[in-house]
Amino acid sequence: MSVTPVLDPEWQRSPEGLDYLSRVLRHNKRKFFGLIERPVLPPHLPADVAAYKVFVCGKSGVGKTSFIAKLSGLAVPSMHHETAGIQTTCMYWPVRPSGSARPVIFRFQFWDCGEGALRKFDHILPACKEKADAVLFLFSFTDRSSFEDVPALISRTLDQDEDVTRVVIGTKLDQYMHTDVTEDDLRDFQRTWQLPVMRVRSVNGPRMTDGRDLDGRAGLAECAPVLNGLAEILWHRDQVIAGLVGGAE
């Protein structure tokens, strides 16, 4: 049975949607926002802001930092470096709820921490989970063990009674010649665990004509499926909590 989206999937391609998207760009490059910054909107572009804390976890080397860099418009690191302590990154993503004339700008605050810090300091995991709206469990398409470890990773990270949205993300989709995880594997996983699975490439997108800076618009288009998917899941959850739409049967 098909489910009607709670967010308009075509709005971002409209002139109005493109105007809102331009507010997270500067000279066709991505703007970067600090913890207390937000896009500046002119009076003719009203919008509400919906803030969400998202904890990104996974075994060392699956590409957590690269995943966040990709979504936020930063350059994907060329070499792996363990994240020291906790790192937070804010990004904004405009959407429009179905049946509404007023857009909503999602404020995603991604929390990332290194596996070594998690093992060494007992306070790291509780801090990352505190008031989190979603936990993203990452695996790499080039590392089958990271995929097979996802159920155990979920159990280690969350108790069964913790009411947090769970999403699985497959990274390094670009390295399809070296993939160790098949589409059949993903279908079996989704059928067994009833969790959404998304896919992301772990390489930089096109660059500007100067050859140095990343093309912001191209980067937004590349990340749109994951950002829209995450926004849809979280907005639907909030609508269910508010009693505005029905939950899953």
From Swiss-Prot:
Residues the record lists as binding GTP: 58-65, 171-174
Lineage: Eukaryota, Metazoa, Chordata, Craniata, Vertebrata
Domain of life: Eukaryota
Keywords: Cell projection, Cilium, Cilium biogenesis/degradation, Cytoplasm, Cytoskeleton, Exocytosis, GTP-binding, Nucleotide-binding, Protein transport, Transport
Chief location of this protein within or outside the cell: cytoplasm
Keyword Ribosomal protein (UniProt): no
Subunit note: Interacts with fuz.
Official protein name in the record: Ciliogenesis and planar polarity effector 2
UniProt-listed InterPro entries: P-loop_NTPase (IPR027417), RSG1 (IPR039677), Small_GTPase (IPR001806)
GO molecular function: GTP binding; GTPase activity
One Pfam family in the UniProt entry: Ras
An annotated GO cellular component: cytoplasm
Cited function: Potential effector of the planar cell polarity signaling pathway. Plays a role in targeted membrane trafficking most probably at the level of vesicle fusion with membranes. Involved in cilium biogenesis by regulating the transport of cargo proteins to the basal body and to the apical tips of cilia. More generally involved in exocytosis in secretory cells.
Gene Ontology annotations of biological process type: cilium assembly; exocytosis; neural tube closure; protein localization; protein transport; regulation of exocytosis; regulation of vesicle fusion
Region (Small GTPase-like): 46-249
SUPFAM superfamilies assigned to the protein according to its UniProt record, in alphabetical order: P-loop containing nucleoside triphosphate hydrolases
Compartment annotation: Cytoplasm, Cytoskeleton, Cilium basal body
Assigned protein family: Belongs to the small GTPase superfamily. Rab family.
